[in-house]
């Protein structure tokens, strides 16, 4: 390529660059004709929409946090109830605490189902709102930069006699900030109506015209590459801003999109984004926040009144009767009164005991304790629950070992009784030869032929002890039997009972044995 050719190309490129610069300058240079700046109310309404959309993320965050708080409070109460049920002293209160804890667990689990849907709703709303706010702010902030020292501008002020760009940020057209994503109240009902975004009614033609001879941006130009203005002819060449928020219809004539009735217009490509944006934002606005809960007797009352409590009480009844839930009916009011008192009058005393329950302080030195009500961290509560579950399990293991030992001792005692000794003899002659045994030819199925004979033992002068069915003992040399009431009462070893004189030592032994057995079974309960 020779020098002349290079010089020619350089000049050509300079001319193109110069023409592009001039065309941008022409767009904001006053000239003959209308060339109006954008009317104040039009563009500030659009900025107001951006401000509304900036609130969406904070609003949905507040609702999501309410869902998390709701479940955490239920978990805190549930865990405290279970710890108390493991550690508390009252059997009846332990049962009530378990029922309340199970109800809280069911409520917490049910809350997860709508929460999953709410997460998607929140994400869509924040995404559409953020994009919409950026689309509006971007186009208007760009128009705000098209100004020259007071002689030209594209955004009219409120009075229609000057540049309004200084009102962009105050009216809502700004860059996004971290504060936009802090929890907040969200848009008001008046801002996001069921039919659309109420603050953008849409305006056309002259209604959007501001101060004249200030902005040639919206002016038609058949040769925009060499003259100020843009090419506006036909459906394919109608420039728009902000995803269709503002469209240039003909020279110096703009159309503001009507958003107050944008609902359900996704099928229209020109309105699809804003209709979808409204649908997403409205869904988030309709999303319900969970009520704030306080972990005290008021939450216990919420549990009692919940539909989940009715489910749990019915399951309790079905389990106790070994039937299916559909096979049983309960008197709900009666069941609630039994567990929680008339008008829930047992709840406050129960909560007082729960929060005042002494528990081990896992973070302190050995032997340190604190009250259960002082613990609010659910992770620490779960550790405490695991601790007391293990303690309770070990105590039950020791109790079971004691019961087994008692049962073995009782079995050994029964195995050494005269009756059992006689039962071991299988031959009639040997049985009858024994001083305390007799052979019975006719016996019931399963019974032994050789049995203990207390009369024979008495006659032979043998003093033996016979184990009773209840585990007690009866002396065969009963000196009280057959005595009259007056004589019986005078004897130190006799007692008048059920119109007969009985050996008091037998009664004492029986009662002692029954007491041991009863104690063993009571121990099983704990």
Curated annotation (Swiss-Prot):
Membrane topology: Lipid-anchor; GPI-anchor
Primary localization class, coarse: membrane
GO-annotated cellular components: plasma membrane; side of membrane
GO BP: symbiont-mediated evasion of host immune response
Superkingdom of origin: Eukaryota
The keyword Membrane belongs to this UniProt entry's keyword annotation: yes
Glycosylated position list: 453
Record's function text: VSG forms a coat on the surface of the parasite. The trypanosome evades the immune response of the host by expressing a series of antigenically distinct VSGs from an estimated 1000 VSG genes.
The protein, known as: Variant surface glycoprotein MITAT 1.4A
Organism in which the protein naturally occurs: Trypanosoma brucei brucei
